[in-house]
C-alpha cells in the first residue's frame, strides 16, 4: 500500500473506492491528477466542504496534482443527491459571483505556485456552456440508460416526491466533468463525500463507454462527518459554520471546535488536522485520562482555525475566549468586544450622557425594576466589563468605556448587554 493510502486509511478518510488494488498500485507508481467538485450554492464554502478540500491538500503534499472544480454550470442546475425536494434555481449572475468567491476560498488551502505540482482551479461552465443540446444528447446522453439512472440512489430516492428533468440530468453533467478532465487533463481520480458515490461511478461509466478500451479512472469517497450526539455536523442554533469570516467570525468558528464532544474529538483530529499519528495518539490518551482539561479540543480548535483563518485570527479568538472565561473583558480591544458580543442585545448611548448603573440595568431589561436593580448591585450580581460593581448609586465614567466605544454589562453569570457609544 502506498504511504498516502496508509495515511488516508489511518485517518478514516476512505469510505468507498471503485478499485482499491488498482488505485493503490497507480498511486505507488506515479503522481496523478485528481479532482473534487464544489458547486456554488452560497457565497461561501462551509465546514462540510473541509474534508474534500483537505484531502486534496493531502494528495498535493504527497506530490500529486489536485484540481479544484468550481461548478459554475452544475450550480445552475442543483445536485439532487439526498435532497428531499427540488432546489430553487439561482440566477446566473449570482451563481457566477458565488463561483468567484469560492475560487478565492479554495486558494487558502491549496498551493497554486508549487514548483513540481501546482494546484489548478477550473470551472465547468467553461465547457458545459459551449455544448449544444444536440451534441449533449447524441454524444453524452446516449451513454445513460434510463434504468441505469433510476437505479441510482440520488434519483430513486426522489421518485416518490418527484424530480424534474433538470435535476435528473445533473448526474450526466457531473459525469461530463470527469470525462472532460480525463480527456484534457489526464485526470484519473475523482474524490468526494459519500453522497457523491452515484455521481462519481456514473462518470467512470461514461469514461468506460466513451474512451478507447483500457481507459482507466478511479473514484474514492470520504465518510459523512457525524456527531456522537446525533445532531448534524456543521450546524449550530445560529445556522451553518461558514469558512468566510464575515459570515462566521473566527471566534465563533473557534468555539465550534472547542465544543466538540469527547467522543468525536480524536476522529476530528484525524479528519481535519495534519498532526502526526504520534501527536494524535497522545491526545487520545489525554481524552481518556483527563477529559476535563479538554486539551484535545483546544488543539483541534487551534489547528483548524489557523488553517482556515490564519494565526492572527486564532490569537484574537483565543483572547476573546480567555477573557470571557476569566471575566477579564476590560483586557479586550474594541474590535474583540465587537466580535465576541455581536449576538448580545445592545443599545446606543451618547458618550456625553450621564448614565447611572441602575437606569442602564432597567433600560437593558437585565433587571425588571429599579428596586431589583439596586438589590442586584448590592448583592454583587452586576459587573461592568467583567469587574463587579456594588455601589447602587454608581454613575458610569469614561474609564468604563472600552476604547470609548463599548461597555459590557453582566447580571448573574450569563446575562450580558452591550452599550455602544456615538
Curated annotation (Swiss-Prot):
PROSITE patterns: AA_TRNA_LIGASE_I, S4. A motif ('HIGH' region) lies at residues 40-49. GO terms for biological process: tyrosyl-tRNA aminoacylation. Its main location: cytoplasm. One of its GO terms (cellular component) is cytosol. It comes from the Bacteria. The keyword Iron does not apply. Gene3D superfamilies: HUPs (3.40.50.620), RNA-binding S4 domain (3.10.290.10), Tyrosyl-Transfer RNA Synthetase (1.10.240.10). Keywords: Aminoacyl-tRNA synthetase, ATP-binding, Cytoplasm, Ligase, Nucleotide-binding, Protein biosynthesis, RNA-binding. L-tyrosine binds at residues 35, 170, 174. Residues 355-421 form the S4 RNA-binding domain. Belongs to the class-I aminoacyl-tRNA synthetase family. TyrS type 1 subfamily. Catalyzes the attachment of tyrosine to tRNA(Tyr) in a two-step reaction: tyrosine is first activated by ATP to form Tyr-AMP and then transferred to the acceptor end of tRNA(Tyr). NCBIfam families: tyrS. This is Tyrosine--tRNA ligase.
Amino acid at each position: 500500500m502506498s504511504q498516502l493510502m496508509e495515511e488516508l486509511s489511518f485517518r478514516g478518510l476512505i469510505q468507498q473506492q471503485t478499485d482499491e488494488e488498482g488505485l493503490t498500485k497507480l498511486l505507488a507508481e506515479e503522481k496523478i491528477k485528481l479532482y473534487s467538485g464544489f458547486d456554488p450554492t452560497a457565497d461561501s464554502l462551509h465546514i462540510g466542504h473541509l474534508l474534500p478540500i483537505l484531502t486534496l491538500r493531502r494528495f498535493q503534499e504527497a506530490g500529486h496534482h489536485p484540481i479544484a472544480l468550481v461548478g459554475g454550470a452544475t450550480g445552475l442546475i442543483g445536485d439532487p443527491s439526498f435532497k428531499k425536494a427540488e432546489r430553487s434555481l439561482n440566477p446566473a449572475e449570482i451563481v457566477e459571483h458565488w463561483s468567484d468567491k469560492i475560487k478565492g476560498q479554495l486558494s487558502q488551502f491549496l498551493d497554486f505556485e508549487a514548483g513540481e505540482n501546482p494546484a489548478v482551479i477550473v470551472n465547468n461552465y467553461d465547457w458545459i456552456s459551449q455544448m449544444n443540446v444536440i451534441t449533449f444528447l447524441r454524444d453524452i446522453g446516449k451513454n445513460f440508460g434510463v434504468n441505469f439512472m433510476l437505479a441510482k440512489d440520488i434519483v430513486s430516492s426522489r421518485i416518490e416526491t418527484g424530480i424534474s428533468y433538470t435535476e435528473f440530468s445533473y448526474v450526466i453533467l457531473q459525469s461530463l466533468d470527469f470525462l472532460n478532465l480525463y480527456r484534457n487533463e489526464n485526470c484519473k481520480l475523482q474524490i468526494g463525500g459519500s453522497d457523491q458515490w452515484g455521481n462519481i461511478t456514473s462518470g467512470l461509466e461514461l469514461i468506460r463507454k466513451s474512451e478507447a478500451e483500457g481507459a482507466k479512472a478511479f473514484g474514492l469517497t470520504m465518510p459523512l462527518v457525524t456527531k456522537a450526539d446525533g445532531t448534524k455536523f456543521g450546524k449550530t442554533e445560529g445556522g451553518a459554520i461558514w469558512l468566510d469570516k464575515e459570515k462566521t467570525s473566527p471566534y465563533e468558528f473557534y468555539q465550534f471546535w472547542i465544543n466538540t464532544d469527547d467522543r468525536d474529538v480524536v476522529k476530528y483530529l484525524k479528519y481535519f488536522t495534519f498532526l502526526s499519528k504520534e501527536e494524535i495518539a497522545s491526545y487520545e490518551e489525554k481524552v481518556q485520562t483527563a477529559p476535563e482539561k479538554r486539551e484535545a479540543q483546544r488543539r483541534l480548535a487551534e489547528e483548524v482555525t489557523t488553517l482556515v483563518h490564519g494565526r492572527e485570527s486564532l490569537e484574537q479568538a483565543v483572547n476573546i475566549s480567555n477573557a470571557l472565561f476569566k471575566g477579564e473583558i476590560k483586557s479586550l480591544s474594541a474590535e474583540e468586544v465587537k466580535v465576541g458580543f455581536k449576538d448580545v442585545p445592545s443599545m446606543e448611548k451618547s458618550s456625553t450622557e450621564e448614565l447611572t448603573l441602575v437606569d442602564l440595568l432597567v433600560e437593558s431589561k437585565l433587571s425588571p425594576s429599579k428596586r431589583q436593580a439596586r438589590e442586584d448591585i448590592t448583592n454583587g450580581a452586576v459587573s461592568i466589563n467583567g469587574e463587579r460593581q456594588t455601589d447602587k448609586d454608581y454613575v458610569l465614567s469614561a474609564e468604563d468605556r472600552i476604547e470609548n466605544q463599548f461597555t459590557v454589562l453582566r447580571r448573574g453569570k450569563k446575562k450580558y448587554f452591550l452599550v455602544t457609544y456615538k
